[in-house]
C-alpha cells in the first residue's frame, strides 16, 4: 500500500490569457456593433445565419414545419407590415407586453414586471436601438445565463400570419422591443416552441441574474402582504400563479387558472374601522381581468376620496386590476419573487459588501449522481460544498406581521439581537439546471432536483477537507433542505446558526445526469468551497518496491522474448494471461488483459514499443499492487467494482485526484453497466502513472510541487 508520506503534487495556475473585463459573453460569437457596421457599409439588412427565419426557428412539434399552426406563416421585418415601426414608443411600460398564441405567459409576465424598473430593463434592452438612423435590421439584448451575462443578436424578421404578429405584441401596434426580446430568448434556447410552459422565476432570473424564490400560499399564510410590499420596495420582481391540472381555464371571476400574472403594486388603507390591503396584478394577455371586489367596475371605488381613486384606478381593458389580499389568497397558489443579485443591486443598504459564491457542476451517472435520499447507498457520491457562516444577522424589529420567511418581509429598523434568541445567519441557496430547456426538442425536460444542508460538528472539521470524508455524510445532522421539484430553479432562504455546513445538491433519482449551477448569497460574511482534492500521487504509487521475479515467470518472459530479450504488446498479453491464470481460477480479476491495454503498459513502462526484463519486473510489481487494491473493492468477487468506487480505489492505490479529473476517468473507464473490471482499472492506473511520471521530470528528486497552466495540464491529462 502507498504510504502517502512523499508526494508529487500538481498545482494548476491561470493561463494568463484572462477573460476580459467581465463584459457580456457574445452568444454564438456575434458582435452587434461589428454586424451593424458591416451591414450599413454594404447596404444589406442583416439576416441571422445562426437563427434563420424559417420553420426550424418556430419549433419542432406543435409549431413544427408540418404542423397546422406553422401553415401560412411569413417572416417579415416590421417596416414590411407596419407603417412607422418604433423600437420604443416614448417609455417602455407594463402594457407594452401582450401575449400572442404562444403559451409563454411566464416569460411575458416577467417582462411586464421588468418594465417597472427602467434601470433593470435597460440592462436587458440596451438603449440606442431603433428603425431610423443607423437601422441595419439587427438588434441585440442581454440575458443572464448561469453566472454571466450573454449578448444575443437577432435580425428583425418576425413570424407573421395574416399581417399580424403570431406571438407577443405591444398595446401600441407599432412598438417592437417586446417581440424582438422574445425572439432573442427563442434564439438562446433553440426555438419559439421551447418557450411553451414555464415558471416566472426562470425568466425573472434570466432578466436580472437574481435569485428566484417560491412561496406556496394557503388561506392563512401569514405575512404575505408584508413580504410582497417589501419585495416590490426592494425592486424585486414578483409574480403569482393560479395552478391548474387542466391547462388554462377561465373562472367566473375573470381569472385564468394555470396562468402567470405579474404583481406590480400594493396599497394599504383604512375604510372606517377596516384595514384594506390591495394587490395590483396584470394579465400578460392585456385583457381578461378580475371581476370581483375592487375590480375596475366595482362600486367600492366610489367609497374612496377622489384623489385616492384617481391615483389607483385606471378603467381600461389592459389586463391590469386590483384585488384584496384575502381574495388573492383564495385564488392563487404560488407567489414567485426574484431578489436582485448583488451585481444589480450594488452595495447593500447597510453599506457592507454582498457575498456570493457561484459553482458550476454536473451530475454524472455512475460517478456523482447519488439520488436525494441521505440514507441511500450512493448518496455520499453527490457533489458537496462546505459552507461556513461567520456573522449572524442583526435582529429586525417588525412594524407589521411576521413575514412568511421568518420576518423577511418586515420593513422595520435593524436593532440588536434580543435576549433569549439564538443568533442566526440568513443565506440564500439557489440551484439551477443548466441548458435543459434547449433539450426539449430531444424529448428531455427538467429533472426533479433539490439540495440538503447538513451541519458539520466541530470535531469533524479537520476531516472534512477532501472527498475521503464522504463516508461520514450519513452520520451528519440535517439542518435544512429545499423542496425537490422539476423546475429549472430551486431556491431556499435558510436561517442557520453560525457554524460549518455541507450543501449537497442532487437529482431526485440515482443516475440522472444534468449540468447545474449552485449559488450562495448572504449579506453577512461567509465562505464556501467545493469539497475537492488536490491532484497528487504518493511516490510509492509511482515507484513499485523492488521484488525479484519468480524464476518460472522470468523464464517464461525469456522464452517469449527470444533473442531480442524484449517483449512487444502482443507477447506481453500472452505472458500476463498465463501469469494471472491462478487469480482467474479464484474468480478474482477474471478475464483477459486486452491488447490495447498491453500497448498502453508497454508505452508507460518500456522504451519505444518494447519491454525489457527489467521493465517487466517493474510493471509486474505495479500489477500485483493494483490487483491487491482492486480485490479490496471487489467485495463480491465478481471481477468488477462499482464505478462510484473508482475514486476510492485510486486513492487507495496512491492517486489523489480532483473532481473534474475523476469524472473524466470514470466516464472513460466504466462500462455500460456502470462497472469497472480489472483490465479497465489497470488501464486507468497505468495512465495516471504515466502522467505523474511525466510531471516528475520537472522536479529535483522527483518530489514536490509541479505548477502547470490549465492548458498544459489538459495536454498532459487528455483522456479522449
Swiss-Prot record:
Residues 393-415 are annotated as: Disordered. Belongs to the peptidase C2 family. This is Calpain-12. The active site is at residues 105, 259, 283. SUPFAM superfamilies: Calpain large subunit, middle domain (domain III), Cysteine proteinases, EF-hand. Residues 542-720 are annotated as: Domain IV. InterPro entries: C2_III (IPR033883), Calpain_cysteine_protease (IPR022684), Calpain_domain_III (IPR022682), Calpain_III (IPR022683), Calpain_III_sf (IPR036213), EF-hand-dom_pair (IPR011992), EF_Hand_1_Ca_BS (IPR018247), EF_hand_dom (IPR002048). Its EC number is 3.4.22.-. It comes from the Eukaryota. It comes from Mus musculus. Transmembrane segments: none annotated. Residues 621-656 form the EF-hand domain. Ca(2+) binds at residues 634, 636, 638, 640, 645.
